[in-house]
């Protein structure tokens, strides 16, 4: 779910050199088309922590509402929720579709959202395995220890491509991807804060 990035020179060269047509969608291509032997590929992990100037509940709202990803994540052409928790209405099964020119991929994930003692977690694990042996993202959101109305956010990304080549090349850009995703959510959370501030108070207009 987190491999949605703005193209950079490295990524453009990467695509030109490595991408092959698959034909999954009409007039489209898959991002990745190579396969490898599972035992030769190692799982990769990236952890990024960032202070975000928004309350933890606002950051949690931005991260957990997958259906809105298409509104603010670059090249996310569609995002959706197939199943929600009947108790809190948070996603249980969700997905997104990433498109860039003629390339197209869709990710479906099991999603687990938890709110425990002012600490929020959102875990997404892919159940569509055309690209990865493993793809898991975990967001941990908690109050900032020194700044009121701010959050301390950690994003853990674990993945293992089916392709040995892509698993190796990903070492070049995975850290940048993680940072871009974190920044996209930071901007989204700030946007939600501004919307809340501009929303008329329920007391306005009362006699």
From Swiss-Prot:
This protein's UniProt keywords: Membrane, Mitochondrion, Mitochondrion inner membrane, Transit peptide
Chief place of localization: mitochondrion
Membrane topology: Peripheral membrane protein
Cell compartment(s), UniProt: Mitochondrion inner membrane
GO biological process, one term: cellular respiration
Gene3D superfamilies: 3.30.530.20
GO molecular function: molecular carrier activity; ubiquinone binding
A GO cellular component annotation in the UniProt record: mitochondrion
Keyword Transit peptide attached: yes
Stored InterPro entries: COQ10-like, COQ10_START, START-like_dom_sf
Span of chain positions assigned to the transit peptide in the UniProt entry: 1-39
Keyword 4Fe-4S applies: no
Description of how the protein assembles with itself and partners: Interacts with coenzyme Q.
Protein's job: Required for the function of coenzyme Q in the respiratory chain. May serve as a chaperone or may be involved in the transport of Q6 from its site of synthesis to the catalytic sites of the respiratory complexes.
Family membership noted in the UniProt record: Belongs to the COQ10 family.
Name of the protein this chain belongs to: Coenzyme Q-binding protein COQ10, mitochondrial
Source species: Saccharomyces cerevisiae (strain ATCC 204508 / S288c) (Baker's yeast)
Gene name of the encoded protein: COQ10
